[in-house]
Amino acid sequence: MKQLTILGSTGSIGCSTLDVVHHNPDSFRVIALVAGKNVARMAEQCLEFSPRYAVMDDTSSAEQLKIMLQQHGSRTEVLSGQQAACEMAALDEVGHVMAAIVGAAGLLPTLAAIRAGKTILLANKESLVTCGRLFMDEVKRSNARLLPVDSEHNAIFQSLPQSIQHNLGYADLEQNGVTSILLTGSGGPFRETPMCDLAAMTPDQACRHPNWSMGRKISVDSATMMNKGLEYIEARWLFNASARQMEVLIHPQSVIHSMVRYQDGSVLAQLGEPDMRTPIAHTMAWPNRVTSGAQPLDFCKLSALTFSAPDYQRYPCLKLAMEAFEQGQAATTALNAANEITVAAFLAQQIRFTDIAGLNLAVLERMDLHEPASVDDVLQVDAIAREVARKQVIRLSR
């Protein structure tokens, strides 16, 4: 039985992970749950899965949780703060850590899991977007293992030969017969919206993804295709891919989750319903397979599968992310931080949808980008970029 810590248990990925546990009670045991401030959901999870530990972001949330659990006779030990989260990621009895805390807050707990030599089920994009080389070097040093949870990276992983799967981030694609990686994306809810109408799009419209059920922040990132840009950066690190070895495709149906092109002309793809439980279950059980709870793909009900090249005028955030990778980790860190601030401002209706890309670019242009040598350096770049972004939002929204 595999013992799990789930970082970000009350979020979308965390809840889907627990659903996979629910479907496979003899295969997985939850040792620790870590979350932010959603006390009610954490209480429900603790009562159903009886973890040994539960960690909340702050003491107030932890106290509320403690009272709720005591009323139900739960023996789960309640802790709070980032240090406790890092300790849960490194517990001796835990072999697998689901890293699903969104944003820069997930960096240190994920790093703690890596340094403890765990198998990390990586759903936190920011870990590689901001700390790609630092994290990949630490994985090798600590003999940890990364298994990608993002549906696209998981699809690529499944389509690659074992020689690359067992040496992620370092294997030479060309020497293993791989020509390129094809990263697919739906194009989001505004794929066919006239360009002249994009400025008027509301947060609710941006969050109506045609295929996936996701949180509001990542839904906006899908609409701008910043999500695909961050996935591009992540794929470059995970699969040791050059710009020449990467292709980005718009695939509106979200049935093919990504592909790998081989030197002999073959293209291997992973298909499935757009349900995150599929890649989650794959990483949890790898190299075996378990029931995910997802519906099987019905080929007889599929419409045509279509593909097109991305329009960078419609999706400037995608181009911005691809260019940031070439500038280095300081640029990708600053872009990610700026984007979190600008998306939050859009969701709060402080700026327009079309302001997001321009503000992100403005932050990059105002930053003095020195390559970070440590996670502390990354966090400093992150903090400065957030402050610059906040000032840009205030200036624009006056």
From Swiss-Prot:
Superkingdom of source: Bacteria
Reaction(s) the record says it catalyses: 2-C-methyl-D-erythritol 4-phosphate + NADP(+) = 1-deoxy-D-xylulose 5-phosphate + NADPH + H(+)
Biological or metabolic pathway of the protein: Isoprenoid biosynthesis; isopentenyl diphosphate biosynthesis via DXP pathway; isopentenyl diphosphate from 1-deoxy-D-xylulose 5-phosphate: step 1/6
Residues where Mn(2+) binds: D150, E152, E231
Binding site residues for 1-deoxy-D-xylulose 5-phosphate: K125, S151, E152, S186, H209, S222, N227, K228, E231
Protein's GO biological process: isopentenyl diphosphate biosynthetic process, methylerythritol 4-phosphate pathway involved in terpenoid biosynthetic process
Pfam family, one: DXPR_C
Enzyme nomenclature, EC number: 1.1.1.267
Broadest EC class assigned to this enzyme: oxidoreductase
Subunit organization: Homodimer.
Role noted for this protein: Catalyzes the NADPH-dependent rearrangement and reduction of 1-deoxy-D-xylulose-5-phosphate (DXP) to 2-C-methyl-D-erythritol 4-phosphate (MEP).
Family stated for the protein in its record: Belongs to the DXR family.
Name of this chain's protein: 1-deoxy-D-xylulose 5-phosphate reductoisomerase
Species in which this protein is naturally found: Salmonella typhi
Gene this protein is translated from: dxr
